[in-house]
Design a protein with these regions (language model features):
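Conserved oxyanion/phosphate-binding beta-strand-loop segments in alpha/beta enzyme cores
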Residues: 56-124, 214-237, 323-353
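Short, surface-exposed alpha-helical recognition segments that flank or form part
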Residues: 88, 94, 104-108, 247-254, ...
Length: 383
């Protein structure tokens, strides 16, 4: 909820109680956006106000009012608490150990929160559109995930790599989230269990794959990052460069100052294989060279030797951890293409084969590029 909004306690004709932002009751939903910016779809009815929806169902009365800040902390039950994933301690499939140790799971931790503002300073929950109450799903979206981490909300991530529901999701298991049949089943379930007020069609901007045209879904997965706590060292290097035009220096510093940790992994087959090996105790080891990899390898070196450090050859190599002695396999991830771009001064100047030659030519005297994207792309990765 938004702590600064006023909410009404609405009693419908069947005696059910609903909480809604007061200003949302008579709000003409999506009316302003489609008058000013977009074209409404021909033949599609305009959206009804919330007040109109309840009047058509037999009417309603307002039996009370409450401030959003007074709702924070309320506990509630949710429509899908019967699914096994909701009973997994610490969340599912990525477990929050601290919450698990406290015996917390999705089913027990539904509570009203005030998510505050986004990174632009705008309220995440607003009056007007919708109900004024937003369900936060930390396992299913970027903003929700950030709020979940900040406020310690249990994360439930339901989808696999094919956007199908995984084992812990009961009657949804194996069904593709974007299939209309799946959507209809979910809507039907909500209706049968009296969790749905109304269904309407409306224009909605939604991300699609630029190649296939398929709908995209958010999916919570573990990734690899370069910690940017050492950003000050990188920023100091900017002053060692003569920028033409001169304002390029400040532009690059602005980007570096606000840059979060750099995600360097991709869930793909093609790409530079990350030299990271994982072990059954949850530890990992970064291999620094082919020579070190050969020294640590206990299996698969003969399949890899003489080939480029890419999949599938490098994936065959298993190593023994130099400290624990555990046997590990390489992570399946490959590197972000901009990670490749950042090592151009090493890969093109023979760093691995001829250090003297590399030292002669590194760093470059002159880099020519077009603006503006390179500040957050190639210049950044080079630095």
């Amino acid at each position: 909820v938004n702590g600064n909004l006023e909410y009404v306690k609405l009693k419908s004709s069947d005696g059910s109680i609903y909480y809604l932002a007061e200003e949302n009751l008579e709000f003409a939903r999506l009316d302003k956006q489609y008058k000013e910016k977009k074209q409404w779809i021909d033949g599609l009815p305009k959206l009804k106000t919330i007040s109109q929806i309840f009047k058509e169902r037999g009417g309603y009365e307002i039996v009370g009012k409450i401030s959003g800040k007074d709702m924070v902390g309320w506990k509630y039950s949710a429509p899908f608490d019967g699914l096994d994933a909701q009973s997994e301690l610490g969340g599912y499939p990525i477990r929050n150990d601290a919450l698990a140790d406290e015996g917390k799971c999705g089913k027990t931790e539904h509570r009203v929160i005030n998510p505050g503002k986004d990174n632009l300073g705008s309220d995440i929950v607003v009056g007007g559109e919708g109900t004024g109450i937003v369900h936060m799903a930390p396992g299913c979206g970027d903003i929700d995930h950030k709020v979940g981490k900040k406020l310690n909300v249990i994360s439930i991530a339901p989808l696999d790599e094919e956007s199908k529901f995984t084992d812990k999701f009961g009657w949804l298991k194996g069904k593709k989230a974007t299939d209309q049949e799946t959507i209809d089943e979910i809507i039907g379930y909500l209706k049968e269990n009296n969790h749905l007020i109304y269904v309407e069609d409306y224009p909605h901007i939604y991300p699609h794959c630029w190649r296939s045209g398929d709908e995209l879904v958010f999916r919570l997965v573990d990734e690899w990052y370069i910690n940017m706590d050492w950003r000050d060292e990188i920023i100091s290097t900017v002053d060692d460069i003569n920028w033409i035009p001169s304002w390029g220096s400040e532009r690059e510093k602005e980007w570096l100052t606000g840059m979060g940790d750099w995600m360097i992994s991709k869930k793909r087959f093609w790409g530079l294989a990350l030299p990271i090996w994982e072990f059954e105790d949850g530890s990992f080891y970064v291999v620094g060279s082919k020579e070190e990899l050969k020294e640590l390898s206990i299996e698969g070196w003969q399949d890899f030797e003489g080939k480029s450090p890419h999949r599938p050859w490098i994936d065959k190599v298993k190593i023994k951890h130099p400290e624990t002695g555990l046997v590990g396999s390489r992570v399946e991830d490959v590197g972000n293409p901009w990670l490749d771009a950042g090592i151009v001064p090493f890969s093109t100047l023979g760093y691995n084969d001829n250090k003297n030659y590399w030292q002669k030519w590194f760093p470059a005297d002159f880099v020519v590029e077009s603006f503006p994207g390179q500040f957050r792309n190639w210049f950044y990765s080079l630095l």
